[in-house]
Amino acid sequence: MSLRILHVLDHSWPVHSGYSIRSLHLIAAQYRLGFRPQALSGPLQFVDDPNATETVVENVTYRRTPFDGKFSEWAISRRRPILREAAVVRLIRNRIVELVENDPVDLIHAHSPALCGLGALQAARSKGIPFVYELRAFWEDAAVDQNKIGTRSFRYRLSQRLEDYVVHRADAVVGISQSILDELKRRKTDPAKLFHVPNGVDVEKFSPVSRDEALAAKLGLGREPVLGFIGSLYRWEGVAWLVRAVAELRRRGTSCKLLIVGDGEEMPAVREAVRDLNAGEFIQILGRVPHDEIERYYSVSDVLVYPRHSIRLTELVTPLKPLEAMALGKAILGSDVGGIRELIEPEKTGLLYRADNVDDFCMQAKRLLEQAGLRRELGARAREIVLREKDWKILARRYVNIYDSAIRNLGL
Protein backbone atom coordinates (compact mmCIF):
# COMPACT_ATOMS: atom_id res chain seq x y z
CA MET A 1 0.00 0.00 0.00
CA SER A 2 2.90 2.36 -0.60
CA LEU A 3 1.10 4.03 -3.51
CA ARG A 4 2.08 7.65 -4.05
CA ILE A 5 -1.17 9.64 -4.12
CA LEU A 6 -1.66 13.29 -5.08
CA HIS A 7 -4.88 14.70 -3.61
CA VAL A 8 -6.21 17.76 -5.45
CA LEU A 9 -8.44 19.95 -3.26
CA ASP A 10 -10.39 23.17 -3.57
CA HIS A 11 -9.04 24.26 -0.18
CA SER A 12 -7.33 22.64 2.77
CA TRP A 13 -6.26 23.14 6.36
CA PRO A 14 -5.86 25.64 8.04
CA VAL A 15 -9.09 26.79 6.35
CA HIS A 16 -11.75 25.44 8.72
CA SER A 17 -14.70 23.77 6.98
CA GLY A 18 -16.35 20.37 6.72
CA TYR A 19 -14.54 19.96 3.40
CA SER A 20 -11.09 20.60 4.87
CA ILE A 21 -11.77 18.47 7.96
CA ARG A 22 -12.76 15.46 5.83
CA SER A 23 -9.64 15.94 3.71
CA LEU A 24 -7.39 16.28 6.75
CA HIS A 25 -8.61 13.12 8.48
CA LEU A 26 -8.87 11.05 5.30
CA ILE A 27 -5.35 11.87 4.13
CA ALA A 28 -3.87 11.40 7.62
CA ALA A 29 -5.58 8.00 7.89
CA GLN A 30 -4.20 7.00 4.48
CA TYR A 31 -0.70 7.96 5.63
CA ARG A 32 -1.02 5.81 8.75
CA LEU A 33 -2.30 2.95 6.58
CA GLY A 34 0.87 2.96 4.50
CA PHE A 35 -0.03 5.15 1.53
CA ARG A 36 2.29 8.01 0.59
CA PRO A 37 -0.15 10.91 0.13
CA GLN A 38 0.49 14.56 -0.61
CA ALA A 39 -2.02 17.32 -1.28
CA LEU A 40 -2.46 20.31 -3.55
CA SER A 41 -5.10 23.02 -3.10
CA GLY A 42 -6.31 25.24 -5.90
CA PRO A 43 -5.61 28.92 -6.63
CA LEU A 44 -8.66 30.19 -4.74
CA GLN A 45 -6.92 29.36 -1.46
CA PHE A 46 -3.80 31.12 -2.73
CA VAL A 47 -5.90 34.30 -3.06
CA ASP A 48 -6.69 34.17 0.67
CA ASP A 49 -3.17 33.28 1.81
CA PRO A 50 -0.59 34.03 -0.91
CA ASN A 51 2.41 33.63 1.40
CA ALA A 52 1.70 30.02 2.40
CA THR A 53 2.98 28.00 -0.57
CA GLU A 54 3.69 24.79 1.34
CA THR A 55 2.98 23.32 4.77
CA VAL A 56 3.23 19.95 6.50
CA VAL A 57 0.25 18.65 8.47
CA GLU A 58 0.39 15.27 10.23
CA ASN A 59 3.43 14.19 8.18
CA VAL A 60 1.76 15.08 4.85
CA THR A 61 2.92 17.91 2.58
CA TYR A 62 0.19 20.34 1.46
CA ARG A 63 1.05 22.65 -1.44
CA ARG A 64 -0.76 25.61 -3.02
CA THR A 65 -1.38 26.67 -6.61
CA PRO A 66 0.05 30.18 -7.14
CA PHE A 67 -0.80 32.53 -9.98
CA ASP A 68 1.45 32.28 -13.02
CA GLY A 69 0.96 35.80 -14.28
CA LYS A 70 -1.10 38.98 -14.16
CA PHE A 71 -3.89 37.61 -16.35
CA SER A 72 -4.69 34.65 -14.09
CA GLU A 73 -4.56 36.90 -11.02
CA TRP A 74 -6.91 39.40 -12.69
CA ALA A 75 -9.36 36.74 -13.91
CA ILE A 76 -9.59 35.01 -10.52
CA SER A 77 -9.36 37.95 -8.12
CA ARG A 78 -11.89 40.02 -10.09
CA ARG A 79 -14.23 37.03 -10.42
CA ARG A 80 -14.65 37.34 -14.17
CA PRO A 81 -17.22 34.70 -15.24
CA ILE A 82 -15.95 31.89 -17.52
CA LEU A 83 -12.49 33.48 -17.63
CA ARG A 84 -12.19 32.81 -13.90
CA GLU A 85 -13.20 29.17 -14.27
CA ALA A 86 -10.88 28.66 -17.24
CA ALA A 87 -7.98 30.20 -15.31
CA VAL A 88 -8.60 27.93 -12.30
CA VAL A 89 -8.59 24.79 -14.48
CA ARG A 90 -5.45 25.82 -16.35
CA LEU A 91 -3.54 26.73 -13.19
CA ILE A 92 -4.43 23.45 -11.48
CA ARG A 93 -3.51 21.41 -14.56
CA ASN A 94 -0.16 23.12 -15.00
CA ARG A 95 0.68 22.96 -11.30
CA ILE A 96 -0.02 19.21 -11.18
CA VAL A 97 2.11 18.58 -14.27
CA GLU A 98 4.94 20.55 -12.66
CA LEU A 99 4.68 18.59 -9.41
CA VAL A 100 4.48 15.09 -10.92
CA GLU A 101 7.39 15.76 -13.27
CA ASN A 102 9.57 16.58 -10.25
CA ASP A 103 8.04 14.05 -7.85
CA PRO A 104 6.20 11.23 -9.70
CA VAL A 105 2.96 9.82 -8.28
CA ASP A 106 1.06 6.58 -8.90
CA LEU A 107 -2.43 8.09 -8.85
CA ILE A 108 -4.19 11.47 -8.84
CA HIS A 109 -7.21 11.76 -6.55
CA ALA A 110 -9.20 14.95 -7.14
CA HIS A 111 -12.04 16.13 -4.94
CA SER A 112 -14.99 18.23 -6.08
CA PRO A 113 -15.80 20.84 -7.33
CA ALA A 114 -15.60 20.07 -11.03
CA LEU A 115 -12.96 22.76 -11.67
CA CYS A 116 -10.50 20.82 -9.50
CA GLY A 117 -11.58 17.63 -11.18
CA LEU A 118 -11.21 18.94 -14.72
CA GLY A 119 -7.74 20.39 -14.16
CA ALA A 120 -6.62 17.17 -12.47
CA LEU A 121 -8.18 15.00 -15.19
CA GLN A 122 -6.34 16.88 -17.92
CA ALA A 123 -3.04 16.56 -16.06
CA ALA A 124 -3.59 12.86 -15.35
CA ARG A 125 -4.39 12.05 -18.97
CA SER A 126 -1.40 14.02 -20.27
CA LYS A 127 0.90 11.95 -18.03
CA GLY A 128 -0.86 8.59 -18.24
CA ILE A 129 -1.68 8.53 -14.52
CA PRO A 130 -4.81 6.82 -13.09
CA PHE A 131 -7.44 9.32 -11.99
CA VAL A 132 -10.00 9.13 -9.17
CA TYR A 133 -12.69 11.77 -8.69
CA GLU A 134 -14.52 12.23 -5.38
CA LEU A 135 -17.82 14.08 -5.06
CA ARG A 136 -18.50 15.79 -1.74
CA ALA A 137 -21.52 17.72 -3.08
CA PHE A 138 -22.93 19.23 -6.24
CA TRP A 139 -21.59 22.73 -5.74
CA GLU A 140 -24.06 24.37 -8.11
CA ASP A 141 -26.83 23.48 -5.63
CA ALA A 142 -25.04 25.35 -2.85
CA ALA A 143 -24.74 28.36 -5.18
CA VAL A 144 -28.50 28.26 -5.77
CA ASP A 145 -29.24 28.35 -2.03
CA GLN A 146 -26.83 31.28 -1.67
CA ASN A 147 -28.72 33.15 -4.43
CA LYS A 148 -25.62 33.24 -6.63
CA ILE A 149 -27.22 31.42 -9.58
CA GLY A 150 -30.59 29.96 -10.58
CA THR A 151 -31.40 26.38 -11.49
CA ARG A 152 -32.11 27.42 -15.08
CA SER A 153 -29.07 29.64 -15.45
CA PHE A 154 -26.23 29.01 -17.88
CA ARG A 155 -23.74 28.67 -15.02
CA TYR A 156 -25.88 26.01 -13.31
CA ARG A 157 -26.13 23.94 -16.48
CA LEU A 158 -22.44 24.46 -17.23
CA SER A 159 -21.47 23.25 -13.77
CA GLN A 160 -23.54 20.10 -14.23
CA ARG A 161 -22.03 19.46 -17.66
CA LEU A 162 -18.49 19.88 -16.32
CA GLU A 163 -19.26 17.51 -13.45
CA ASP A 164 -20.63 14.90 -15.84
CA TYR A 165 -17.62 15.30 -18.13
CA VAL A 166 -15.17 14.60 -15.30
CA VAL A 167 -17.22 11.78 -13.76
CA HIS A 168 -17.68 9.91 -17.02
CA ARG A 169 -13.95 10.04 -17.80
CA ALA A 170 -12.60 9.20 -14.35
CA ASP A 171 -11.15 5.74 -13.75
CA ALA A 172 -13.06 5.50 -10.46
CA VAL A 173 -15.60 7.77 -8.77
CA VAL A 174 -16.23 8.16 -5.03
CA GLY A 175 -19.41 9.62 -3.52
CA ILE A 176 -19.71 10.58 0.15
CA SER A 177 -23.40 9.64 0.27
CA GLN A 178 -25.62 6.99 -1.27
CA SER A 179 -27.86 9.79 -2.55
CA ILE A 180 -24.97 11.26 -4.56
CA LEU A 181 -24.25 7.84 -6.07
CA ASP A 182 -27.93 7.42 -6.98
CA GLU A 183 -27.86 10.81 -8.71
CA LEU A 184 -24.74 9.80 -10.66
CA LYS A 185 -26.44 6.61 -11.80
CA ARG A 186 -29.39 8.71 -12.95
CA ARG A 187 -26.89 10.69 -15.02
CA LYS A 188 -25.81 7.45 -16.73
CA THR A 189 -22.51 6.93 -14.90
CA ASP A 190 -21.18 3.37 -15.12
CA PRO A 191 -22.18 1.77 -11.77
CA ALA A 192 -19.10 -0.48 -11.89
CA LYS A 193 -16.80 2.46 -11.21
CA LEU A 194 -18.86 4.03 -8.41
CA PHE A 195 -17.73 3.65 -4.79
CA HIS A 196 -19.12 4.87 -1.47
CA VAL A 197 -16.88 6.34 1.24
CA PRO A 198 -19.10 8.17 3.74
CA ASN A 199 -18.01 10.86 6.12
CA GLY A 200 -16.11 9.63 9.15
CA VAL A 201 -14.78 10.90 12.44
CA ASP A 202 -11.63 10.68 14.53
CA VAL A 203 -12.96 8.50 17.37
CA GLU A 204 -9.87 9.10 19.49
CA LYS A 205 -10.29 12.87 19.42
CA PHE A 206 -14.06 12.70 19.84
CA SER A 207 -14.75 10.39 22.77
CA PRO A 208 -17.22 10.87 25.64
CA VAL A 209 -16.23 13.48 28.22
CA SER A 210 -17.84 14.79 31.39
CA ARG A 211 -19.71 18.08 31.42
CA ASP A 212 -17.31 21.00 31.59
CA GLU A 213 -18.72 22.64 34.71
CA ALA A 214 -16.37 25.62 34.45
CA LEU A 215 -17.62 26.43 30.95
CA ALA A 216 -21.23 25.83 31.97
CA ALA A 217 -20.82 28.30 34.84
CA LYS A 218 -19.11 30.84 32.59
CA LEU A 219 -22.03 30.64 30.16
CA GLY A 220 -24.59 30.78 32.96
CA LEU A 221 -26.32 27.61 31.83
CA GLY A 222 -27.65 26.53 35.21
CA ARG A 223 -29.49 23.20 35.29
CA GLU A 224 -31.88 23.71 32.38
CA PRO A 225 -31.28 21.18 29.58
CA VAL A 226 -29.31 22.62 26.68
CA LEU A 227 -29.86 22.29 22.95
CA GLY A 228 -26.70 22.89 20.95
CA PHE A 229 -25.97 23.73 17.35
CA ILE A 230 -22.29 23.43 16.45
CA GLY A 231 -21.36 24.04 12.83
CA SER A 232 -21.27 26.49 9.95
CA LEU A 233 -24.12 28.95 9.57
CA TYR A 234 -25.12 28.44 5.96
CA ARG A 235 -28.71 29.21 5.05
CA TRP A 236 -29.50 25.56 4.39
CA GLU A 237 -28.49 24.63 7.95
CA GLY A 238 -31.69 26.30 9.19
CA VAL A 239 -30.31 27.99 12.30
CA ALA A 240 -32.51 31.10 12.06
CA TRP A 241 -35.47 28.72 11.79
CA LEU A 242 -34.16 26.87 14.85
CA VAL A 243 -34.17 30.09 16.89
CA ARG A 244 -37.86 30.58 16.14
CA ALA A 245 -38.63 26.90 16.80
CA VAL A 246 -36.91 26.95 20.20
CA ALA A 247 -38.80 30.11 21.17
CA GLU A 248 -42.03 28.29 20.31
CA LEU A 249 -40.87 25.22 22.25
CA ARG A 250 -40.41 27.34 25.37
CA ARG A 251 -43.74 29.11 24.81
CA ARG A 252 -45.35 25.66 24.95
CA GLY A 253 -43.81 25.05 28.36
CA THR A 254 -40.62 23.05 27.71
CA SER A 255 -37.69 24.41 29.69
CA CYS A 256 -34.40 24.64 27.74
CA LYS A 257 -31.62 26.85 26.48
CA LEU A 258 -29.94 27.00 23.08
CA LEU A 259 -26.24 27.45 22.33
CA ILE A 260 -25.17 28.39 18.79
CA VAL A 261 -21.48 27.76 18.11
CA GLY A 262 -20.14 28.71 14.69
CA ASP A 263 -20.27 31.45 12.11
CA GLY A 264 -21.27 31.99 8.51
CA GLU A 265 -23.50 33.78 6.05
CA GLU A 266 -26.70 33.30 8.08
CA MET A 267 -25.33 34.95 11.22
CA PRO A 268 -27.11 38.31 10.59
CA ALA A 269 -30.45 36.50 10.17
CA VAL A 270 -29.81 34.46 13.32
CA ARG A 271 -29.01 37.56 15.38
CA GLU A 272 -32.06 39.34 13.99
CA ALA A 273 -34.32 36.41 14.93
CA VAL A 274 -32.98 36.41 18.50
CA ARG A 275 -33.58 40.18 18.78
CA ASP A 276 -37.06 40.03 17.27
CA LEU A 277 -38.12 37.31 19.70
CA ASN A 278 -36.39 38.86 22.74
CA ALA A 279 -34.76 35.47 23.12
CA GLY A 280 -31.39 36.60 24.46
CA GLU A 281 -32.10 35.19 27.92
CA PHE A 282 -32.28 31.60 26.69
CA ILE A 283 -30.33 31.67 23.40
CA GLN A 284 -26.61 32.40 23.29
CA ILE A 285 -24.73 33.01 20.05
CA LEU A 286 -21.08 32.24 20.70
CA GLY A 287 -19.68 32.49 17.19
CA ARG A 288 -16.57 30.60 16.13
CA VAL A 289 -14.50 28.95 18.87
CA PRO A 290 -11.01 27.39 18.66
CA HIS A 291 -11.18 23.97 17.03
CA ASP A 292 -9.19 22.34 19.83
CA GLU A 293 -11.81 23.51 22.36
CA ILE A 294 -14.89 22.29 20.51
CA GLU A 295 -15.34 19.22 22.75
CA ARG A 296 -15.95 21.56 25.71
CA TYR A 297 -19.00 23.02 23.96
CA TYR A 298 -20.30 19.58 23.03
CA SER A 299 -19.95 18.58 26.69
CA VAL A 300 -22.36 21.28 27.92
CA SER A 301 -24.97 20.47 25.25
CA ASP A 302 -27.49 17.77 26.18
CA VAL A 303 -28.96 17.47 22.68
CA LEU A 304 -27.26 18.39 19.41
CA VAL A 305 -29.67 19.75 16.80
CA TYR A 306 -29.27 19.68 13.01
CA PRO A 307 -32.24 21.64 11.61
CA ARG A 308 -31.43 21.51 7.89
CA HIS A 309 -34.02 22.81 5.46
CA SER A 310 -35.20 20.43 2.76
CA ILE A 311 -33.53 21.50 -0.47
CA ARG A 312 -31.77 19.53 -3.18
CA LEU A 313 -28.35 19.94 -1.55
CA THR A 314 -29.40 18.71 1.91
CA GLU A 315 -31.32 15.78 0.45
CA LEU A 316 -28.16 14.59 -1.32
CA VAL A 317 -25.28 15.51 0.99
CA THR A 318 -24.47 14.09 4.42
CA PRO A 319 -23.19 16.53 7.07
CA LEU A 320 -20.02 15.89 9.07
CA LYS A 321 -20.88 17.40 12.45
CA PRO A 322 -23.46 14.80 13.57
CA LEU A 323 -20.72 12.18 13.47
CA GLU A 324 -18.70 14.16 16.01
CA ALA A 325 -21.72 14.27 18.31
CA MET A 326 -22.35 10.55 17.80
CA ALA A 327 -18.71 9.73 18.63
CA LEU A 328 -19.11 11.73 21.84
CA GLY A 329 -22.18 9.69 22.77
CA LYS A 330 -24.53 12.65 22.46
CA ALA A 331 -28.26 12.58 21.75
CA ILE A 332 -29.13 13.96 18.32
CA LEU A 333 -32.24 15.63 16.94
CA GLY A 334 -32.23 16.23 13.20
CA SER A 335 -34.57 17.13 10.38
CA ASP A 336 -35.52 14.20 8.17
CA VAL A 337 -33.70 15.40 5.04
CA GLY A 338 -31.93 12.70 3.04
CA GLY A 339 -28.41 13.59 4.12
CA ILE A 340 -29.29 13.23 7.81
CA ARG A 341 -31.44 10.11 7.32
CA GLU A 342 -28.31 8.37 6.01
CA LEU A 343 -26.64 8.99 9.37
CA ILE A 344 -29.43 8.65 11.94
CA GLU A 345 -31.68 5.64 12.48
CA PRO A 346 -34.82 7.04 14.16
CA GLU A 347 -35.40 5.82 17.72
CA LYS A 348 -32.09 3.91 17.61
CA THR A 349 -29.27 6.45 17.20
CA GLY A 350 -31.24 9.70 17.38
CA LEU A 351 -34.60 11.31 16.70
CA LEU A 352 -35.81 12.93 13.49
CA TYR A 353 -38.58 15.45 12.90
CA ARG A 354 -40.29 16.48 9.68
CA ALA A 355 -38.10 19.15 8.09
CA ASP A 356 -39.34 22.72 8.61
CA ASN A 357 -42.24 21.51 10.78
CA VAL A 358 -42.28 23.39 14.10
CA ASP A 359 -44.95 21.19 15.70
CA ASP A 360 -43.02 17.99 15.04
CA PHE A 361 -39.78 19.63 16.17
CA CYS A 362 -41.35 20.66 19.47
CA MET A 363 -42.75 17.18 20.07
CA GLN A 364 -39.44 15.38 19.46
CA ALA A 365 -37.36 18.00 21.30
CA LYS A 366 -39.66 17.77 24.33
CA ARG A 367 -39.10 13.99 24.46
CA LEU A 368 -35.33 14.36 24.47
CA LEU A 369 -35.14 17.30 26.84
CA GLU A 370 -37.38 15.69 29.45
CA GLN A 371 -36.00 12.12 29.28
CA ALA A 372 -32.35 11.89 30.30
CA GLY A 373 -32.50 8.10 30.04
CA LEU A 374 -33.57 8.30 26.40
CA ARG A 375 -30.71 10.69 25.68
CA ARG A 376 -28.21 8.27 27.23
CA GLU A 377 -29.57 5.27 25.31
CA LEU A 378 -29.54 7.02 21.94
CA GLY A 379 -26.08 8.45 22.54
CA ALA A 380 -24.60 5.10 23.56
CA ARG A 381 -25.98 3.33 20.48
CA ALA A 382 -24.81 6.17 18.23
CA ARG A 383 -21.26 5.83 19.54
CA GLU A 384 -21.35 2.05 18.96
CA ILE A 385 -22.26 2.62 15.31
CA VAL A 386 -19.52 5.20 14.85
CA LEU A 387 -16.87 2.94 16.36
CA ARG A 388 -17.94 0.07 14.13
CA GLU A 389 -18.57 1.89 10.84
CA LYS A 390 -17.43 5.53 10.80
CA ASP A 391 -13.88 5.50 12.21
CA TRP A 392 -11.51 7.03 9.63
CA LYS A 393 -9.08 4.17 10.22
CA ILE A 394 -11.76 1.79 8.91
CA LEU A 395 -13.01 4.00 6.07
CA ALA A 396 -9.52 4.71 4.71
CA ARG A 397 -9.11 1.01 3.92
CA ARG A 398 -11.84 1.29 1.28
CA TYR A 399 -9.43 3.23 -0.90
CA VAL A 400 -7.25 0.15 -1.36
CA ASN A 401 -9.88 -1.42 -3.63
CA ILE A 402 -10.86 1.92 -5.16
CA TYR A 403 -7.30 2.71 -6.23
CA ASP A 404 -6.76 -0.85 -7.50
CA SER A 405 -9.89 -0.48 -9.63
CA ALA A 406 -8.75 2.89 -11.01
CA ILE A 407 -5.36 1.48 -11.97
CA ARG A 408 -7.04 -1.44 -13.76
CA ASN A 409 -9.50 0.87 -15.53
CA LEU A 410 -6.88 3.31 -16.85
CA GLY A 411 -7.22 3.57 -20.59
CA LEU A 412 -10.30 1.34 -20.88
Q: Model segments located where?
A:
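Conserved acidic donor-binding segment of nucleotide-sugar-dependent glycosyltransferases
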Residues: 346-347, 351-358, 367-373
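Acidic donor-binding loop of glycosyltransferase active sites
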Residues: 104-107, 171, 298-315, 330-331
